[in-house]
Each structure stands twice: as structure tokens, then as C-alpha cells.
């Protein structure tokens, strides 16, 4: 789960500014939720 979050963060940095950003934020939030679930 942690590697998935890190890779999604790196992908967000590579995406141009014109790309849909909300979708990336939603994916990162989903990864954070998964990390919290595994940590808990």
C-alpha cells in the first residue's frame, strides 16, 4: 500500500498542469485510506 501511494505521488508530479487533477487527488486519498486501514 505504501509503494502504491509513493508511485501515485510520483506520477502526480510527472503529470502536466493541464491534466485533470481532481482524479489524481481522489486516487491519492484512496491510497491514504488504504494505508490507514492497514496501519489500524
Swiss-Prot record:
Positions that bind alpha-D-mannopyranose:
11
| Span of the signal peptide | none
- What GO molecular functions are on record for this protein? D-mannose binding
Which UniProt keywords are given for this protein, alphabetically ordered? Antibiotic, Antimicrobial, Fungicide, Lectin, Mannose-binding, Plant defense
Give tissue specificity per the record.
Answer: Expressed in seeds (at the protein level).
GO biological process annotations for this chain's record?
defense response to bacterium; defense response to fungus; killing of cells of another organism; negative regulation of cell population proliferation
- For this protein, the parts annotated as crossing the membrane are none
The Gnk2-homologous domain sits at: 3-40
- Which chain positions lie within coiled-coil regions? none
What the protein does comes down to: Possesses antifungal activity against B.cinerea, M.arachidicola, F.oxysporum, R.solani and C.comatus and moderate antibacterial activity against S.aureus, P.aeruginosa and E.coli. Inhibits HIV-1 reverse transcriptase and proliferation of murine splenocytes. Exerts antifungal activity through its carbohydrate-binding specificity.
Name assigned to this protein: Antifungal protein ginkbilobin-1
Task: Please tell me the species this chain comes from.
Answer: Ginkgo biloba (Ginkgo)
Its organism's taxonomic lineage begins at: Eukaryota, Viridiplantae, Streptophyta, Embryophyta, Tracheophyta
Amino acid at each position: 500500500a505504501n509503494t502504491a501511494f509513493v508511485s501515485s505521488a510520483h506520477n502526480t508530479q510527472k503529470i502536466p498542469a493541464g491534466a485533470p487533477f481532481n482524479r489524481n487527488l481522489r486516487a491519492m486519498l484512496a491510497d491514504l485510506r488504504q494505508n490507514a486501514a492497514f496501519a489500524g
